[in-house]
């Protein structure tokens, strides 16, 4: 059969193929509760959460994150972020948006520029730059690696490093490297979307921040035992 005899059939198939192509990247939504836990240190028990919700496609997403803690029924720390996430390379995204700390002494609203993705050796990497009033800048680096011990048991080491280019004595924060956070979690994946876990976290103030914290009578390092659950839907 010659090519011109196929043309009517191709004409009929073209709209169907175009519609299928439009649905290759559908709009989806997800809520990921990465951490919902009790953090235990001496006689203190904190409720800690870290969650992310998004709406969009593989290429474009609108993302809202919330992270914070409560002690004795009162919120002691909280961060909200709303940003646009765009895929820029396989396994890598660019993020641009807004960072807000509602519990800060002064209203804390900053612009957010970040990049996140999977580095070699399957290390989940997040690098964020927060720009505040004037020339105030904060840089955050977070690294995480999931190590699957068995089909259900997963060990996750995590590290975080924070730096500032300004001093805030009210928050016992100096300029330069300020915080180092290390954490280790062991999770049991009951289902792919539900996993209870136990863990330990170590937090350390660095540089001038350590000096300001020590001068205020507070500890420069803290260790927490953690018991919690992660889930998504």
Residue map of PLM features:
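Residues that define the transmembrane beta-barrel architecture of outer-membrane proteins
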Residues: 27, 45-49, 76-78, 107-111, ...
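Membrane-embedded beta-strands of outer-membrane beta-barrel proteins
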Residues: 51, 82, 113, 141-143, ...
